[in-house]
UniProtKB/Swiss-Prot annotation:
Belongs to the RemA family. Pfam families: RemA-like. InterPro entries: RemA-like. This is Putative regulatory protein THA_332. It comes from the Bacteria. PANTHER family: REGULATORY PROTEIN SSL2874-RELATED, REGULATORY PROTEIN TM_1690-RELATED.
Length: 94
């Protein structure tokens, strides 16, 4: 229950579909990025800037972002808390 999450430059993703947000510096993640590119499952949302985070979706799509993983994680948590607040309001009315 995360809704849409801003990953930079006006790009948003469906938060419920993301299974991991990782730092792109390790060799295995670089290979994962190359494999996704070959399979047509790479989504580059960096606008030509340095990749600072790799997001992995439940459909094995790899999304590149120029935003730090910590910042994206904070946005996930903020979205979660906002949805929880809305649900609390609905529960209190009902």
């Amino acid at each position: 229950m995360f809704g849409l999450i801003n990953i930079g430059f006006g790009n948003v993703i469906a938060g419920d579909r993301i299974v991991a947000i990782v730092n792109p510096e390790s060799a295995p993640l670089k290979r994962l990025k190359e494999d996704a590119k070959e399979e047509g499952k790479l989504i580059d949302a960096t606008y030509g800037r340095k990749t600072r985070a790799i997001l992995i979706s439940d459909s094995n799509h790899i999304i590149l972002s120029a935003i730090q993983p910590e910042t994206i994680a904070q946005r996930f948590m903020q979205s979660f808390f906002e949805i929880e607040e809305q649900l609390d309001k609905i529960r209190r009315k009902g």
